[in-house]
Amino acid sequence: MSERLLVLVRHGQSEWNLKNLFTGWKDPDLTEQGVSEAKEAGRKLKAHGLTFDVAFTSELTRAQHTLKLILDELGQPGLPTSRNLALNERDYGDLSGLNKDDARAKWGEEQVHVWRRSYDVPPPGGESLKDTLARALPYYVQEILPGVLRGQRTLVAAHGNSLRALIMVLEKLTPEGILKRELATGVPIIYRLKADSTVESKLDLAG
């Protein structure tokens, strides 16, 4: 029986991560460090003997570039890939493009903290984490998971908050639990699933 392999990786450091800006659906590329992180992710996966049958990513450059660099390291540059905005980062609305310190100065530290760290309170014109999960989860269940369960070795390169949606389901986390989960840039997480789609094993390639 073929293995049910699912690997999740957050994009490498972006130019706006470096500048401490709210990014969301804005589209900066990777920094030099981000490029290095993505290549290292590919090398780590190769060292574990992994190759893939299919990949998924968002409509944003930083995730697509990360995926390309990983696949180049794996010697799989032509891997079939689906891109979909369901995997885009959380939309930060009016916060997008603002320095996080400037946002605190404008709205107050407590309000910005609520927007960033609550489960269901969106910033003006943007999405809450709950909203982000509401678009990412159906895509995972309908488009990604069926292939994994058929034995397609699957790689997903996306964003901190859209990946939280997948992790919330995989690890059966509560809203409070997923809020506490931080995802490092460019670090693959390897899941192997049981036939009922629950997690058989998990390996985080941090470090």
UniProtKB/Swiss-Prot annotation:
SMART domains: PGAM (SM00855). PROSITE patterns: PG_MUTASE. The record marks H159 as: Transition state stabilizer. It is an enzyme of class 5 (isomerase). InterPro entries: His_Pase_superF_clade-1 (IPR013078), His_PPase_superfam (IPR029033), PG/BPGM_mutase_AS (IPR001345), Phosphogly_mut1 (IPR005952). Pathway: Carbohydrate degradation; glycolysis; pyruvate from D-glyceraldehyde 3-phosphate: step 3/5. GO terms for molecular function: phosphoglycerate mutase activity. Its EC number is 5.4.2.11. The keyword Isomerase applies. Keywords: Gluconeogenesis, Glycolysis, Isomerase. It comes from the Bacteria. GO terms for biological process: gluconeogenesis; glycolytic process. The active site is at H11, E89. Substrate binds at residues 10-17, 23-24, 62, 89-92, 100, 116-117, 160-161. Gene3D superfamilies: Phosphoglycerate mutase-like (3.40.50.1240). Homodimer. Catalyzes the interconversion of 2-phosphoglycerate and 3-phosphoglycerate. Belongs to the phosphoglycerate mutase family. BPG-dependent PGAM subfamily. This is 2,3-bisphosphoglycerate-dependent phosphoglycerate mutase. It comes from Bradyrhizobium sp. (strain BTAi1 / ATCC BAA-1182).
